[in-house]
């Protein structure tokens, strides 16, 4: 492709850009895995001041990759600079949970971060910005950012449950012996937390209903808790949280949002509710969605049985409590 044939670069901002998830993410973005093989990228890397020196090293490695699609790399510790002109914003950085910290403490610690980032996105990001929050608690951090960006359409703010979706696919593939490519229409509902509900009700394996291939005991006592607790299991096994798999899921999320889901397929994204399936309006909750033309739509009309209803309601209750907590703390409006 000649220089004259190249499209204008897409500006991609990544926060927490010196961290482990970003390290697994940035090189794949630069390679074209996220936005396709013909889309040039301008990377804006955002970090806290103490991590900028480390980030310089990451930028050097990106340069050394000589990626044909990587037009430019900018480094900043200022959100108002880092989000300038952003078409895609991946909010990876967040205050991690430390020993003795309750979930309420985590919400209080992350509130100012996502308030500032939401305000910066509102002021300086591109008109077509798409936001994915990866940093936990992702759903509620996304709600805070969205609440502080009143001029950006609410549907542009999403949180990542694609990692949970991919984990669910992997567990079903392992159980049935089918390749992941033969598994379709899994759904993840609710919060990206241990209350999430990975749902096989409508899933298929090589065209057969998944529920015909697995027993109820495995579903309830193995599959669901394994997916819910997978992050904890990885921490216990490797002594660090999921990084490469989280990065891969972020790539998948943006790729499908921008370029579309395959015909007849859906994925899982945490998006502002429109009231579907009894989830309160505006709550950022995971749903099965389809994507086309740069937009997502919640899959409509799915049957929700009593077991699923109970699981969805439990996760939504947790999200509602988190929303009430950040409203009370002054980070968002109810």
Curated annotation (Swiss-Prot):
Residue numbers binding NAD(+): 16-22, 110, 117, 134-136
Keyword NAD applies: yes
GO biological process: malate metabolic process; tricarboxylic acid cycle
Family annotation (InterPro entries): L-lactate/malate_DH, Lactate/malate_DH_C, Lactate/malate_DH_N, Lactate_DH/Glyco_Ohase_4_C, Malate_DH_AS, Malate_DH_type2, NAD(P)-bd_dom_sf
Alphabetized UniProt keyword annotations: NAD, Oxidoreductase, Tricarboxylic acid cycle
Domain of life: Bacteria
CDD domains to which the protein is assigned, alphabetical: MDH_chloroplast-like
Protein's UniProt keywords contain Oxidoreductase: yes
Leading EC class: oxidoreductase
Catalytic residue positions: 192 (proton acceptor)
Molecular function terms from GO: L-malate dehydrogenase (NAD+) activity
Function recorded in the entry: Catalyzes the reversible oxidation of malate to oxaloacetate.
PANTHER family given in the database record: MALATE DEHYDROGENASE
The protein's name in its UniProt record: Malate dehydrogenase
């Amino acid at each position: 492709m000649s220089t004259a044939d190249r499209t204008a670069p897409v500006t991609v901002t990544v926060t927490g850009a010196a961290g482990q998830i970003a390290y697994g993410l940035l090189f794949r973005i630069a390679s074209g895995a996220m936005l396709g093989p013909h889309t040039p990228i301008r990377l804006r890397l955002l970090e806290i001041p103490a991590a900028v020196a480390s980030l310089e090293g990451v930028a050097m490695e990106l340069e050394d990759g000589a990626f044909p699609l990587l037009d430019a790399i900018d480094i900043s510790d200022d959100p108002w600079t880092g989000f300038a002109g952003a078409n895609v914003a991946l909010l990876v950085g967040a205050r991690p949970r430390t020993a003795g910290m309750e979930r309420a403490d985590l919400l209080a610690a992350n509130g100012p971060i996502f308030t500032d980032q939401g305000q910066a996105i509102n002021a300086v990001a591109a008109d077509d910005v798409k936001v994915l929050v990866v940093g936990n608690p992702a759903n509620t951090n996304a709600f805070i950012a969205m609440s502080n960006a009143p001029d950006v359409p609410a549907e542009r703010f999403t949180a990542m449950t694609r990692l949970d979706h991919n984990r669910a696919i992997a567990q079903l593939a392992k159980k049935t012996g089918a390749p992941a490519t033969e598994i379709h229409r899994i759904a993840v509902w609710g919060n990206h937390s241990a209350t999430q509900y990975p749902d096989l009700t409508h899933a298929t394996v090589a065209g057969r209903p998944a529920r015909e291939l697995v027993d109820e005991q495995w579903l309830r006592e193995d599959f669901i808790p394994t997916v819910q607790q997978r992050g904890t299991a990885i921490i216990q096994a490797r002594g660090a949280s999921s990084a490469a798999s989280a990065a891969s899921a972020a790539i998948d999320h943006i790729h499908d949002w921008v370029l579309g889901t395959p015909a007849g397929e859906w994925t899982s994204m945490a998006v502002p509710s429109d009231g579907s399936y009894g989830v309160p309006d505006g709550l950022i909750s995971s749903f099965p969605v389809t994507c086309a033309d740069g937009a997502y739509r919640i899959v409509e009309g799915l049957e929700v049985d009593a077991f699923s209803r109970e699981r969805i309601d439990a996760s939504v209750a947790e999200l509602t409590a988190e929303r009430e907590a950040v409203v009370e703390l002054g980070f968002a409006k109810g």
